[in-house]
Structures are given as structure tokens and as C-alpha cells.
């Protein structure tokens, strides 16, 4: 029996969004078995309502793995004050909502409203979680929500970003069996199945090395600034190496802008009280989620874990001592908690089973039935553009796929130029 957190039913009440639950099988191979509830949010276009069909629906499949839809729009988003700091540094949906409604689904097991797992319970089972909270089940959950929320015959689009690409590919494979097809689906800076795990991880680390060097070019005294942040952390009784959690800020935006944002964030860190620093570290992926660790292994690095891969990439792509290093964060996956340390060590020795995917020929057949846009992104610290283009090649289908490179890093599709590209592509579809 897996441990779950309780979901507050008050999460349904909202003055702007339409929120709800859809019942779904816990195990789609046993539809008559136990069921869980999948939480969704339908966000209206600006100045509209959730039911306004004049604005088509875009289903945004968020990244992770292991993060709920609130990572893309907070549950307590301040609609009256869109520029409020509480809404986060990037409003991923503000451009989409000019013309579309957006449908978000909490992926099962994440810390949201869809059967959230209690990942702080020592009884968690990595193998069971990998099987039952897979990208395949998440794709089927999205289909169940679409069938409930989007009326039959009404066109909709999908954007699968980051880990969402795995869920998106699983969804496309369902269309071979008659699942509702989107009018078009975007795979933006996304993970894709059948990648070489070591090669893609080396590419990711090499891209972050380039971004560190670019940071030093833009901010010549960045080493000194980072040293001050380390001193600040140490003075508060925190591990100065937590500065490596800043890897998520590398390449976060277009060239010439993200570097200034990084420098400004360093200044903020020097003023933050201890509690706020710890929260910033958690919120910006400076700590490892165990759900992410499990699902990342099952989807991205079958037969390995993030930590076993990180040990190899650190040797293959060495860093200078001052540099921001994601691999340090990964090395701390156990968090210093004895049962977590044992859990992660056991996973490293015996990773969970790989998530099954349709074959490449089957996925190409599914792509041939759909309209697909792939968008590599410059400055992407997670899915480097060159690595992504290589991964895309096996899925290119003439007449069905297009590739458009975007500026702006990992969230490029949600920025202004990415949105213009989306509008132009969507408008070109029959």
C-alpha cells in the first residue's frame, strides 16, 4: 500500500479557473480495479471565461518529472495583480492566455491534487512508483481529462515541454488506437524516448559549462559574487555548496538578459533571511525530489540513476571550482536523512524498471497522423539545442513535423518569440 497525502477539497473553489477531478483507474491494465482522482485546471483566456469556446484549449503538459501543475502556475496565482512577486519569476501562461484557454493536469503522484504520494514516508517503493506513476499512465490521465473537459469535435492543441515530452509521446501512441487527436502538438525543449542516456547527459553538462563561461564573460567578477553568497550561506549555518542550486538560473532567458537576471538574483540572496534562502533553494530545484529521482531513472536513464550518470559526466566534463554544478545537487539526493540515503543508495544499485514506450516505427506512425512542431531552444541548460536536434531526427516525418529553433532557454515556447512561433504554426494548420 503506497502512502498518500490528503487533498483538501477546498482546492476546487476558485473565482477564475474551472477546477475539477476526473476518476481514472489506478492501473489502466485493470480498469475494474481501484481508482484515483485526477485534478485539472481550465484557465480562461484573458477577459474571458473557462467555457468560452471561441478561445481554443491548449493542453500544457508540464515538465518534471514529479512536479504538479502549480510549477507552471501557482494555485494561489494573483489574477488581479499579474506582476505580483508571489506569481513567480516566469509567467509561462501569460502569452498563451491572450488567445487560448489553458488546460493543466496535475500528474499523478505529484505534490498536487492527483493522488499525491507522501515521498517522506520510508515505506515508499521505487519499483511500484515507477510502474504505477509512469508517463504512460500520465498520458492516459490526460486523455481522461480531455474527454471530460473538451467537448467532442472541439479542436485542441497540446504543448509538451521538458519531461512533458515523454507524456506527449505516450499520448501520441494512444492516437494509433483511436484516442482523440490534437489539432497540433508542440514538443518544446522536451525529453524524447530512445535517447542515449550518457550522451544526452554529457550534452547537458557541456551546455551548462558553456553557460557558466558565458556568465563569467558577462559578469567578470562573478566568482567573487558567488564567493560572497557562499559566505552568506555559511554565516547562517547553511551548507555553502547550496550555491550549486543556482544551476536552474543558467540560460534562463535570452542572451544578454538572463545573465543580468542571474546577477540580480545573487544580490537578492545576500539580503534574504535564512528561511527565505532555504525556500528559494527548494523552489528552484536546489534539492532533489525522490519522485523525480525515481521517474527520471525509469524514463531518462533506464538501468541507471541520475546519481550514477552524474558521477560519469563529472569525470567526462570537468568544471572549474567556482562554477555552478548541477551534479553536486544530484550527489545530495539522500539529503543527509538516513532512510533517504539508504533508499537512494539501493536505487543506485538496482534502478527501477524502465518505462515501456511504443517502438520508434510505431511512434513515427502516430506522428504521421498528427501535426507536430519541435522547438529546440538556445541557452537551454536542460535540453541543449544540438542534442535535441539529434534526438528529433528519428521522429521526423515529412508533411507532419516541423522544427523551429527559439531563443530564450528551457521555457522559450512560453516567451514572446516562442508564442509568436506557436501562433504562426497553429494558424498554418488546416
Where do the model's predicted regions map?
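Gly/Pro-rich cap/lid or specificity-loop segments adjacent to the active site
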Residues: 4-36, 41-236, 325-365, 370, ...
Amino acid at each position: 500500500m503506497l502512502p498518500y497525502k490528503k487533498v483538501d477539497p477546498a482546492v476546487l473553489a476558485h473565482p477564475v479557473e474551472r477546477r475539477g477531478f476526473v476518476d481514472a483507474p489506478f492501473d489502466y491494465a485493470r480498469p475494474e480495479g481501484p481508482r484515483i482522482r485526477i485534478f485539472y485546471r481550465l484557465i480562461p483566456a484573458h477577459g474571458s471565461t473557462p467555457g468560452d469556446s471561441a478561445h481554443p484549449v491548449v493542453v500544457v503538459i508540464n515538465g518534471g518529472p514529479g512536479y504538479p501543475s502549480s510549477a507552471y502556475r501557482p494555485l494561489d496565482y494573483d489574477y488581479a495583480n499579474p506582476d505580483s512577486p508571489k506569481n513567480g519569476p516566469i509567467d509561462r501562461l501569460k502569452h498563451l492566455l491572450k488567445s487560448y484557454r489553458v488546460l493543466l493536469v496535475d500528474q499523478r503522484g505529484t505534490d498536487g491534487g492527483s493522488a499525491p504520494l507522501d515521498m517522506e514516508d520510508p515505506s515508499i517503493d521505487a519499483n511500484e512508483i515507477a510502474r504505477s506513476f509512469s508517463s504512460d499512465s500520465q498520458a492516459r490521465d490526460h486523455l481522461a481529462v480531455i474527454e471530460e473537459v473538451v467537448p467532442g469535435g472541439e479542436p485542441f492543441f497540446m504543448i509538451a515541454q521538458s519531461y512533458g515530452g515523454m507524456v506527449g509521446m505516450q499520448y501520441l501512441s494512444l492516437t494509433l488506437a483511436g484516442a482523440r487527436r490534437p489539432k497540433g502538438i508542440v514538443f518544446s525543449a522536451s525529453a524524447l524516448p530512445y535517447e542515449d542516456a550518457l550522451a544526452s547527459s554529457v550534452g547537458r553538462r557541456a551546455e551548462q559549462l558553456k553557460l557558466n563561461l558565458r556568465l563569467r564573460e558577462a559578469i567578470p567578477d562573478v566568482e567573487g559574487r558567488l564567493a560572497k553568497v557562499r559566505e552568506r550561506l555559511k554565516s547562517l549555518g547553511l551548507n555553502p555548496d547550496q550555491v550549486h542550486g543556482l544551476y536552474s538560473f543558467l540560460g534562463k532567458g535570452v542572451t544578454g538578459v538572463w545573465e543580468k537576471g542571474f546577477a540580480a538574483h545573487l544580490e537578492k540572496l545576500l539580503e534574504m533571511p535564512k528561511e527565505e534562502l532555504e525556500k528559494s533553494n527548494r523552489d528552484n530545484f536546489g534539492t532533489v525530489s525522490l519522485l523525480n529521482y525515481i521517474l527520471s531513472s525509469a524514463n531518462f536513464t533506464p538501468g541507471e540513476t541520475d546519481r550514477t550518470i552524474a558521477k560519469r559526466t563529472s569525470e567526462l566534463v570537468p568544471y572549474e571550482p567556482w562554477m555552478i554544478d548541477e551534479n553536486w545537487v544530484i550527489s545530495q539526493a539522500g539529503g543527509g536523512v538516513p532512510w533517504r540515503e539508504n533508499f537512494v543508495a539501493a536505487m543506485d544499485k538496482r534502478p527501477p524498471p524502465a518505462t515501456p514506450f511504443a517502438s520508434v516505427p510505431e511512434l513515427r506512425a502516430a506522428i504521421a497522423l498528427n501535426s507536430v512542431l519541435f522547438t529546440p531552444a538556445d541557452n537551454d541548460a536542460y535540453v541543449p539545442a544540438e542534442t535535441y536536434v539529434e534526438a528529433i531526427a528519428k521522429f521526423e516525418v515529412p508533411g507532419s513535423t516541423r522544427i523551429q529553433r527559439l531563443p530564450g532557454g528551457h521555457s522559450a515556447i512560453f516567451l514572446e518569440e516562442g508564442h509568436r512561433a506557436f501562433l504562426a504554426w497553429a494558424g498554418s494548420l488546416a
